A protein has these predicted regions:
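Class I SAM-dependent methyltransferase "Motif I" SAM/SAH-binding loop
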Residues: 19-21
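Conserved alpha-helix/loop element of class I SAM-dependent methyltransferases that forms part
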Residues: 1-11
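SAM-dependent methyltransferase
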Residues: 116-198
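C-terminal lobe and adjacent flexible extensions of AdoMet/dcAdoMet transferase-like proteins
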Residues: 188-237
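A short acidic, Gly/Pro-enriched loop at the edge of an enzyme's catalytic core
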Residues: 68-77
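Class I SAM-dependent methyltransferase SAM/SAH-binding core
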Residues: 24-68
């Protein structure tokens, strides 16, 4: 919201959010006065989104596969947040799917429109993803009293393919105390380089106007040497 307000002067925008999930970002955007459309492939997350948007007239969401679906046209802003680039589920080659996301975002913009993209950049992914250690990155309880948490066992990173493979399981405890354990199979993620992402933006006809490091006003260094939470504001040529 801060970046959008800074770049648009607070003028209401027609916004598309790809992979909107439960509406964590889309709903506040609509409440701020923007006209918002969101889509996601996860029907269960969309159920949460449908519940949250009830009574808000300037937001709608629908179910679609971002890799294969048409994203629409003539949006002022397309938003790709929440590390969407490394959380794509598709049968397509991972790097190809990442490039496709950016191309589709560009196609959905009006001339002069902007892509707002938020993601993690890893200049040294081996240091982050080569680890064998149990950890949990999520735990929560839903409105029915079901508690869930993730348990990760570790991951390995291949510097040639830039694929990170991880394994772990989900633990679910229902409101009557019954516990279930589901193997998650782990993650299969392509960790793109800064050059790749910058190149995909250029190939899609997008010009980077501003970058933000770690949600501050400091620009993202080029090259990034370690880890950098990155926000990009890019205009359609």
């Amino acid at each position: 919201l801060k970046v959008l307000k800074e770049q648009t002067g607070g003028t209401p925008q027609r916004i598309l959010e790809a992979a909107c999930g439960g509406g964590r970002i889309s709903v506040p955007l609509a409440q701020a006065g923007h006209d918002v459309t969101g889509f996601d492939v996860d029907e269960y997350m969309l159920m949460r989104c449908y519940a949250r948007i009830s009574g808000i007239p300037n937001i709608r969401c629908y179910c679609a596969d971002a890799v294969t679906a048409d994203w629409g046209r003539d949006y002022d802003v397309v938003l790709m947040a929440g590390n969407v680039l490394i959380n794509i589920e598709s049968e397509t080659d991972y790097a190809e799917a990442q490039a496709t996301f950016i191309k589709k975002a560009a196609c959905a913009l009006r001339p002069g429109g902007h892509l707002l993209m938020d993601f993690d950049l890893h200049g040294n992914p081996e240091a982050v993803f080569n680890r064998l250690k149990q950890s949990s990155y999520f735990q929560g309880t839903d409105e029915f009293g079901t508690t869930g948490k993730t348990i990760g066992y570790g991951s390995v990173f291949d510097p040639v393919t830039r694929i990170c493979e991880a394994t772990g399981h989900w633990e679910l405890t229902t409101n009557n105390g019954e516990t279930f354990i589901y193997p998650s199979g782990g993650g299969h993620k392509h960790i793109p380089t800064q050059r790749q992402i910058w190149g995909w933006l250029e190939d899609a006809g997008l010009s980077i106007e501003r970058t933000y490091k770690g949600y501050t006003d400091e620009p993202v260094p080029d090259p990034v040497e370690g880890y950098c939470k990155t926000t990009v504001w890019a205009q359609k040529n």
